[in-house]
UniProtKB/Swiss-Prot annotation:
Transmembrane segments: none annotated. HAMAP family: SmpB. It is found in: Cytoplasm. It comes from the Bacteria. SUPFAM superfamilies: Small protein B (SmpB). One of its GO terms (molecular function) is RNA binding. GO terms for cellular component: cytosol. This is SsrA-binding protein. Required for rescue of stalled ribosomes mediated by trans-translation. Binds to transfer-messenger RNA (tmRNA), required for stable association of tmRNA with ribosomes. tmRNA and SmpB together mimic tRNA shape, replacing the anticodon stem-loop with SmpB. tmRNA is encoded by the ssrA gene; the 2 termini fold to resemble tRNA(Ala) and it encodes a 'tag peptide', a short internal open reading frame. During trans-translation Ala-aminoacylated tmRNA acts like a tRNA, entering the A-site of stalled ribosomes, displacing the stalled mRNA. The lineage of its organism: Bacteria, Pseudomonadati, Pseudomonadota, Gammaproteobacteria, Aeromonadales. InterPro entries: SmpB, SsrA-bd_prot, SsrA-bd_prot_CS. Keywords: Cytoplasm, RNA-binding. Residues 133-160 are annotated as: Disordered.
Length: 160
């Protein structure tokens, strides 16, 4: 008799960076692991993370996540110092790191975190290789979104 494995329902997303898609053209996406401490994992399980103002910086051939806030739980241990905005190392393959370093340094791309999510028992960060948008590009996107919304509304009302 085989055992049925129960899968936990729900969303595996911990945090989204909605501002990133508004402020940048996303050219390519990468998945990176995140080096965390124990209290950070517990806080992430509780969903206490914010990556809205964070960015990725490449130093000495390694990638680091700056500005991400993981709020510690109230029941955290007293002998561990919890720094909510500490710099966290991103875990990428060497070939991916070399490619990203080349693009960021030579072609003026920016690396920004798009989302933080669970992949099995591991926390992953989706990194976007991006270029900044100008103000007129943002307005064009807004007009396009409004047009799509109006078009949907017209099609919905037409069927009535």
């Amino acid at each position: 008799m085989s055992k049925n494995k129960t899968k936990k329902g729900g969303d595996s997303t911990i945090a989204l960076n909605k501002k990133a898609r508004h402020d940048y053209f996303i050219e390519d996406k990468y998945e990176a692991g995140l080096a965390l401490q124990g209290w950070e994992v517990k806080s992430l399980r509780a969903g206490k993370a914010h990556i809205g103002d964070s960015y990725v910086l490449l130093q000495n051939g390694e990638a680091f996540l700056f500005g991400a806030t993981i709020t510690p739980l109230n029941v955290a241990s007293t002998h561990v110092v919890c720094d909510p905005t500490r710099i966290r190392k991103l875990l990428l393959k060497k070939s991916e790191l070399e490619r990203l370093i080349g693009l960021v340094e030579r072609q003026s791309y920016t690396l920004i975190p798009l989302s933080m999510y669970w992949s099995r028992a591991w926390v992953k960060v989706e990194i976007g290789l991006a270029k900044g948008k100008k103000e007129h590009d943002k307005r064009e996107d807004l007009k396009e979104r409004e047009w799509q919304r109006d078009k949907e509304r017209m099609m919905k009302n037409k069927g009535r």
